[in-house]
Amino acid sequence: MQTKETRGLVLYNRPFREDDKLVKIFTETSGKHMFFVRHATNSKLSSVIQPLILANFILKINNHGLSYIEDYKGVSLFKEINADIYKLAYATYLVSLADAAISDAVYDAPLFAFLIKTLELMDEGLDYEILTNIFEIQILDRFGVQLNFHDCVFCHRVGLAFDFSHRYSGLLCPEHYEKDLYRSHLDPNVPYLLNQFQTLHFDSLKTISVKPDMKQKLRKFIDEVYEDYIGLRLKSKKFIDDLDHWGQVMK
C-alpha cells in the first residue's frame, strides 16, 4: 500500500456489515478508490465520508483491493447544493457520471478538476441544468464517443442551420440533409449551443442564460445521445427525470 496526501471528493458511501462502510472517493492524484471505514457511526471519519465532501485526505491506497482513510483536513462543503433538492439531484448525477466515465484507480486529474469546478459553479448559483449539459457533452470522449458539432461532415462549412445525423455522428448542412432520412430534425440552436458547450472553458464563464424551451430541447437531444451512443442508465438520472416530472405536475 502507498500512503498519499491528496485532495478527494466523496462520491458515495454504502453500508458494509453491521456498522462499517465502504466509501468511494475520487482522488486528484490516484483516481477513484473504494475505502473501508470500520465502525463508521462512531468513527472520527463519520462527518467526512458523506457524499459531496471535498477534503485533503491522507490515504493508504491499495490498487488491488480496499484502501483506508488515515486522516483528513481542509474540509469543504457545497452548502448551497446540499440546501436545494434540485441542485443536489443534479450534483449527484454529475458525480455518478464521473464515476461511470473512468475505471477505478485510473489517474484523471483533468476530469477531477472539471468535476470540482462544475460543482463550485453550481454552488455559486449558476444554472445547474446547463452546467450539467456542458459536463455531459465534454466528457463524452471518456466514453469513447467523438461527435462533431462544428461543421458539416460532408462539405465542412460552418455557421449554417445544421441538423444532427446519428448515422454520421455529426452535423448535416441544409444541402446535405438528404444524406440521412432519419436525421434528428433539431432546432438549429441546439447544435449551435452544443458546439459552444464542447469547447467552453469554465474560467471564462460568468453567467448563463438559456430559455426554458431550449433547455428542454437540449435535454431531449443529450438524452438521445447518451442512450444511442453509450447506453448508460444511471439511477441518479432517473431521479432527476422523476423530479422534473413532479415539478411540472405541481406547477
Curated annotation (Swiss-Prot):
Record-linked Pfam families: RecO_C (PF02565), RecO_N (PF11967)
Record keyword DNA repair present: yes
Signal peptide extent: none
GO CC annotation terms, alphabetical: bacterial nucleoid
Coiled-coil residue spans: none
Family: Belongs to the RecO family.
Annotated keywords: DNA damage, DNA recombination, DNA repair
Biological role: Involved in DNA repair and RecF pathway recombination.
GO biological process terms on file: DNA recombination; double-strand break repair
Protein name, UniProt field: DNA repair protein RecO
SUPFAM superfamilies: ArfGap/RecO-like zinc finger, Nucleic acid-binding proteins
Superkingdom, taxonomy of origin: Bacteria
